[in-house]
From Swiss-Prot:
GO terms of biological process kind: endoplasmic reticulum tubular network organization; membrane organization
GO CC, any one term: endoplasmic reticulum
Compositional bias of kind Low complexity: 13-25
Membrane topology term: Multi-pass membrane protein
Classification via InterPro entries: PER33/POM33_regulator, TMEM33/Pom33
Gene name of this polypeptide: npp-25
Region Disordered, residue ranges: 1-32
Keyword entries, A-Z: Membrane, Transmembrane, Transmembrane helix
Name of protein: Transmembrane protein 33 homolog
Subcellular location: Membrane
Length: 271
């Protein structure tokens, strides 16, 4: 899922050779835009534009949920629309990743499981059918915002626009992507105790933590996005430092080590 990089431009400027003065001081002319207008880009890249629209809707509904006084969509309705738009986004993204090749065999299922888009499609469907948990909206909203910013810079550059906002957006995504991925990974981990608490409060199904555990296992094993593994490693290091501290009571230290061993024993291999 972590493809927050701009694709290189395949178009190269051609040299004419006629009237060349041989002067090294003149800068080369900028390459012509790949598309003459935004409408032309949309016609040539329809799926990318549909994904962009779905991501913008995800962010829009998230803002309506997190800032209720906007008032365009009721907060309760906006919450579930976040995950509906997110599920549509990841379903379309998964379709493009597997290139529409569907088969009922073990090889196809294995290919499906390793796709990050499949992980977040499962995530979106799980929370679409569960009681509202505000933190659950954070990962899909951040992903939608990052990908939307990346798409905006791409379409503006490829249609010849020279707005000053383009380098600012590129700089923002380049500098904040790793921080955003870390926030996403931590929020996904911290959701576990919240989902367990839903069961004791009578708002959650017994199947919810098990379904979410499967999602978290897939994220941990992801070969394209190591953020979840890194977050677990950082938390493990922090807890070990606490357990080794002389001020930590021995029963607490023992409990921490047992918890670390319990979780580490269930860590899946990288796919």
């Amino acid at each position: 899922m972590v493809e927050i990089v701009e694709e290189p431009d395949d178009h190269q400027s051609s040299s004419t050779g006629a009237g060349s003065s041989g002067s090294s001081s003149a800068p080369p002319p900028p390459p012509p835009p790949a598309y003459s207008s935004i409408s032309q880009y949309v016609s040539a890249n329809t799926m990318e534009c549909v994904l962009f629209a779905a991501r913008v809707l995800t962010v829009f509904f998230a803002l309506n949920y997190m800032i209720p006084f906007i008032g365009l969509v009721p907060a309760h309705s906006a919450y579930y629309k976040i995950f509906a738009a997110s599920a549509a986004t990841f379903a379309l993204r998964l379709h493009t990743r597997i290139q529409g090749q569907f088969a009922l065999n073990a090889q196809f299922i294995q290919r499906l499981i390793i796709e990050d888009s499949f992980h977040y499609l499962v995530y979106s469907v799980v929370f679409l059918m569960a009681a509202p948990v505000s933190m659950a909206a954070l990962p899909v909203t951040i992903y939608a915002a990052l990908h939307a910013c990346t798409f905006m810079t791409k379409i503006l550059r490829e249609t010849g626009h020279t707005s000053s906002i383009i380098p600012k957006l590129e700089q923002f995504t380049a500098h904040q992507t790793q921080n955003a991925l870390g926030i996403i990974a931590c929020s996904e981990i911290f959701l576990v105790p919240l989902l367990v608490s839903l069961i004791f409060s009578g708002k959650g199904s017994l199947l919810l933590p098990f379904a979410y555990y499967r999602f978290l296992s897939l994220r941990y094993a992801s070969r394209r996005n190591p953020s979840t593994r890194q977050a677990f490693a950082q938390m493990r290091g922090s807890l070990q430092n606490v357990a080794m501290s002389s001020s930590c009571p021995r029963p607490i230290s023992s409990l921490i080590y047992r918890a670390i061993d319990f979780i580490s024993a269930r860590a899946p291999p990288v796919m």
